[in-house]
Amino acid sequence: MARPDGRLPDHLRPVTLTRGWSTHPEGSVLVEFGATRVLCTASVTEGVPRWRKGSGLGWVTAEYAMLPRATNTRSDRESVKGRVGGRTHEISRLIGRSLRASIDLKALGENSIVLDCDVLQADGGTRTAAITGAYVALHDAVTWLAARRSLAGRPETVMHRSVAAVSVGVVAGEPRLDLNYAEDASAEVDLNVVCTGAGDFVEVQGTGEAGVFSRGQLDALLDLAVAGCVELAEAQRKALS
C-alpha cells in the first residue's frame, strides 16, 4: 500500500529548521516536518526555581500548546477552559525530559531556560517535531548565555549531546517512518522515539493501537527510528553550522 504522500517506508518528510524566526527570544526555531509546523522559542531567566536554589544546577523545562486552528477543526484554547489538558501536560513533560538529556545542568549554572513549543499547523508528529526544533533553540540560548559569560562551565561542555525525535508505526502491516496524520490515525502500532545523535535512546513511547505487536516488529520500528533520528541530527548540525 502506497503512502499518502508517495514516500518510501523509510523516508522522512521534508525537514526544515529555520533559526531566528522570532525576534525577541534568546533562541527561536520554526521546525517543519512536511506540513507540520511548530514554533520553538527558548527564554533565558537568571536564577532557578526555589527548590533548585543553591544546588549549582540549572533548569530546563518546556511548555507545549496548539493554536486553535492548527487542525482541521477549531479547538478551544486551554486558557479559556481554565485547565491544561492531560495530553498537553504529558507532551510538555516529554519535551522537557528529552532536552534535559542534551545538556549538562551543572555547566549551565543556576540559569533557567524555558522552551515554548507552539504548534502552528498539525499533520502528525507534532511532539517529535517540537523536540527536534527545541533542541536547536536551546542550543542558541546556551550560545547567548556563553556570549555573556553567564555559564558555570566551559561553553563547549554545556550541550554535550544532540537530541531529536521521530514517530514510527505499522500501517497496513508495513513499518513506516515519520507518520503524517492520515497514517497515524490508521496505524496498528504507533511509537514516538527520542534519540541522541549517536543513536542512543532517551525515551520510547509505544502502543498497539489495534492489537498486539511482535518483538520483531518492535525491533524493525526501533531500527527505523534510530536511522531517522540520525538523519535529523545531521539536519540539526547543518542548521547550527
Curated annotation (Swiss-Prot):
Coiled coil residues, start to end: none
InterPro entries documented for this protein: ExoRNase_PH_dom1, ExoRNase_PH_dom2, ExoRNase_PH_dom2_sf, PNPase/RNase_PH_dom_sf, Ribosomal_Su5_D2-typ_SF, RNase_PH, RNase_PH_bac-type, RNase_PH_CS
Domain of life: Bacteria
PROSITE patterns, A to Z: RIBONUCLEASE_PH
The EC number(s) this enzyme carries: 2.7.7.56
RNA-binding found in the keyword field: yes
GO molecular function annotation: 3'-5'-RNA exonuclease activity; tRNA binding; tRNA nucleotidyltransferase activity
Residue numbers binding phosphate: 87, 125-127
Entries under Gene3D superfamilies matching the protein: GHMP Kinase, N-terminal domain (3.30.230.70)
Sequence similarity: Belongs to the RNase PH family.
NCBIfam families registered for this protein in UniProt: RNasePH (TIGR01966)
Subunit-level organization: Homohexameric ring arranged as a trimer of dimers.
Protein name (database record): Ribonuclease PH
Organism: Salinispora tropica (strain ATCC BAA-916 / DSM 44818 / JCM 13857 / NBRC 105044 / CNB-440)
